A protein has these predicted regions:
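Hydrophobic helical membrane-anchoring modules
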Residues: 151, 158, 165-234
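Conserved donor-nucleotide/metal-binding helix-loop-beta segment in metal-dependent transferases, i.e.
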Residues: 91-110
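Glycine-rich, basic loop-to-helix element that forms the pyrophosphate-binding segment
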Residues: 57-74
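Short, well-formed alpha-helical segments that are part of the catalytic scaffolds
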Residues: 11-25
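Cell-envelope/extracellular polymer assembly enzymes that use nucleotide-activated donors
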Residues: 2-4, 159
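A conserved acidic beta->alpha catalytic loop
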Residues: 36-44
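Short aromatic/hydrophobic "clamp" motif used to bind/position activated sugar donors
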Residues: 79
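Short beta-strand-to-loop element that shapes/binds the nucleotide-sugar donor at the catalytic cleft/hinge
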Residues: 109-123
Length: 234
């Protein structure tokens, strides 16, 4: 069973090459797909320098949609979602994330960046706040448990947690040490970064009520995937 790494990227020209270097040289990764979500910088040009499949959406559709496009093109049953704004990615990180799923010990393994023993304990042991990491490995069947309505924008990570457990699949969390991440305020400027963070937090907060309290997904009707124009480079 092979593993496809999928990067949903929006204007990640500063860090994407380092992430791709790690993925394309790893023996644990069999295929890499980059989905540029309407990037306006050199994200697509950088991706095309590597032996990967590059899908360039002509407009921005949100992270969940870009991930969905990547899954549609993936050749393998193990999916490794990776953020394009990370740095210091090593093969040890990749192996720690892929191995539990590839070895049959978990159906979804979520990578949590180390933030110190206290914060790690509060987050993972005391469950103070949802696990919303964009770095995760899963079987394709776990991805397919998520209703279409949640495969958009910032909803997808919280929805994956909910439906992985609800469907009886096994979720594992793995703390990843020495993995860097470029924060929104650094990429987009203070004001735009804070606004983007607020938008994401508000969307996730309302989503959690929907997923766990109102459960509107129980009577939701499957939706067709919206059609988007894109350029494909293989």
């Amino acid at each position: 069973m092979g593993t496809t790494a999928i990067i949903a990227a929006f204007n990640e020209e500063k860090t994407l090459a380092d992430v791709l270097r790690a993925l394309t040289s790893s023996p644990h990764i069999d295929e890499v797909i980059v989905v540029s979500d309407g990037s306006t910088d050199d994200t697509v040009e950088i991706a095309r320098q590597f032996d990967v499949t590059t899908i360039a959406l002509r407009q921005n559709h949100g992270k969940g949609y870009a991930m969905r496009i990547g899954v549609a093109w993936a050749s393998h049953e193990t999916l490794f979602f990776v953020d394009g704004d990370m740095f210091n990615v090593t093969d040890d990180h990749i192996e720690a994330l892929v191995r539990p799923v590839a070895g049959g010990d978990a159906d979804m393994n979520v990578g949590i960046r180390h933030r110190g023993p206290v914060l790690d304990f509060l987050h993972l042991k005391m469950h103070c706040g949802p696990v919303l990491s964009g770095i995760r490995v899963m079987r394709r069947s776990v991805w397919e448990t998520v209703p279409d309505k949640y495969m958009e924008r910032f909803k997808i990570e919280a929805a994956l947690n909910r439906f992985c457990t609800y469907s009886g699949y096994r979720q594992q969390n793995t703390v990843i040490y020495n993995l860097g991440h470029v924060i929104k305020e650094s990429k987009r400027g203070i004001l735009n970064g804070l606004f983007s963070r607020w938008e994401m937090s508000r969307e996730v907060f309302l989503l959690l009520f929907d997923l766990y309290l109102f459960e509107t997904w129980r009577w939701s009707v499957p939706e067709e995937m919206p059609v988007a124009e894109y350029d494909l480079f293989e």
